[in-house]
């Protein structure tokens, strides 16, 4: 509208500009009067009337004498924070029914942000709902109960748990001990290598032995018993000393003088020598001396054994 006035003023038509201004002022006043009439009749805006089953809050503006709808939380805050004085607007709870008109219910909503048990209709709250504040709305209220209009509680409302009962944590299941024997052996830890030191030799595990038969028994090894010392026995046949004649006989047989060289045609002939000529037989006196020496040696050995 302002742009229209400026355009008309620039064109120079002052009479036309004044006419347009008068028409605009008349239409604004007429629209304001119509809004006051509809609000005084208790009709809420289309946005609030479309919400069937919702709760609203309204108050009368003392300056313009208009009933204005407010949010539920804002109205409760006004009641909780401000005392009911004529200067402060008071809240009146409204319930929008099936026909789109507000229904005054004294039991809903309660004061102090508490939602009552709507299954039992009932208890009036501390909110002041005197008909002096909203006389036009109280005339439109019906006599229907809460159970017929409000079928279910608000979606965010949950009943409080009973006092003194707490949830017990579930007990873990008890496992029975296993009876199976596990053949799993933990691996042997490998020692860390040390610096400037030779690693110790690792023990080699022997190869697995073959299983022995069932009826096999190890061989019985005889136990070594201590031996008792036995006395030294004298020889039964004493050895006779070698005679000089036998030694000479062996030397003669090995070193035989050969005056002529051997020829393959002539056979080798050795001179025949008798034993009696080379070594005479031993005498009896020599044999007796040997026997006496042997007897004396045996007697000495026997005496030494007895002394020990």
Curated annotation (Swiss-Prot):
Signal peptide: 1-22
GO biological process: symbiont-mediated perturbation of host natural killer cell mediated immune response
Residue ranges with Low complexity bias: 132-145
Cellular localisation: Host cell membrane; Host Golgi apparatus
Gene Ontology CC terms, in alphabetical order: host cell Golgi apparatus; host cell plasma membrane; membrane
Region (Disordered): 103-274
Keyword vocabulary terms for this entry: Host cell membrane, Host Golgi apparatus, Host membrane, Host-virus interaction, Membrane, Modulation of host NK-cell activity by virus, Signal, Viral immunoevasion
Protein family according to the UniProt entry: Belongs to the HCMV UL135 family.
Record note on quaternary structure: Interacts with host components of the WAVE2 complex ABI1, NAP1 and WAVE2. Also interacts with host ABI2 and TLN1.
Protein's UniProt name: Protein UL135
Source organism of the structure: Human cytomegalovirus (strain Towne) (HHV-5)
